[in-house]
Amino acid sequence: MSNHYVDADGHVMEDADDILTFVKPPFHNRGTRNWMPSLDHFHTPADGTPRAPGTFDPTIGPEEWLQFLAQTGTEYTVLYPTTGLAFGNVAYPQWALAYAQAYNEYIHTRYLQRSPQLQAVALIPMQQVPEAVAELRRAVQDLGFVGAMLPSNGLTRHVSHPEYWPIYAEAERLNCMLAVHGGSYMNLGFNTYTVFPATRALGMPFPLAIAATGMIVDGVFDRFPQLRVGFMEGGTAWIPLVIDRLEREVAYGGLKLTRHPEEYFKDDRIFVGCEGNEKALAYAIERVGPKPFMFASDFPHEISIANCMEEINEVLERHDLKHEHKAAILGENARRFYGR
């Protein structure tokens, strides 16, 4: 197997001062304090949870990313934001538009123009759907983004609501991906947890399950048959849960679906980021096949270069996955999803 892997989900450590240089009037001279709302009140070092060496380094930029790709034998990465994971929590539509435009210009200038190994998803201001459609079009056609991120939390309506369907129609027309990315845990039932890792353990997969379930039952994948949507950084164990619960609702709860719940995961419509050491991965493949699953490094968040190599090797050395499954997970599926 080639060692040219694809990293389906890496992260930018945003430079707020640099992004400021791309902000248009009237917001450009308002300072950099509180650019982005907090992900939640859980992401704080005050709980005493230690961080591994080499993770969450704010100095990581395009050059460090290229070094990471070279050292891990990775063909390219697709970059998601860090503070921008809270983008759904932005309350002011005008600021959402201004920040999305500035962030996308920043990523285009600092990362995309630096190397084709650095791909990225755009931010789009879903607080104003017409502006989100226009920014998605600009990001993909003019700036070279592979698609855009959908917030996992914070929007005033569920991501499956028809209000957002013009965005899905435009993504389908552009033949670009969209992806829901976990990371914002507010109002998900974790407010009384006293240990942050417990919040993160459940706070990553549950918003993905909520988003995917809504998009299935509200008919998004039926209305837009060519739409590709990713669900990132929540692992794979939530997939059998969603399928089994929807099956029961179809059987006994009056839920009407055009297809069996499993079928939505089998036809290149839904893609899912995964880690190398997930025991649930083999069972998820047994249920829906290998096509949805994409290896994701999460660098430079909880993962260092050494951790990433360990997880790649864990995929390669697994005895419960076929050779063709490993090839799909480590590159083929991501290339198909991102169109690169």
Where in this protein do the model-derived segments appear?
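Alpha-helical scaffold segments that form or flank carboxylate-/histidine-based iron centers
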Residues: 6-8, 94, 124-131, 156
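Active-site-proximal, glycine-rich beta->alpha crossover segments in alpha/beta enzymes
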Residues: 60, 81-102, 109-115, 125, ...
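Short aromatic-enriched loop/helix-cap "lid" or pocket-rim segments at secondary-structure transitions
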Residues: 16-20, 90-91, 190-193, 241-245, ...
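Mid-to-C-terminal alpha-helical segments outside catalytic/metal-binding sites
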Residues: 2-6, 15-76, 105-113, 134-138, ...
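Catalytic pocket-lining loop regions of alpha/beta-barrel enzymes
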Residues: 112-119, 130, 135-294
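Short glycine-enriched loops at secondary-structure junctions
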Residues: 82, 126, 182-187, 277, ...
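Divalent metal-dependent hydrolysis catalytic cores, especially in the metallo-beta-lactamase
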Residues: 48-54, 66-90, 117-125, 146-150
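Charged helix-capping and loop-helix junction motifs
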Residues: 96-103, 160-166
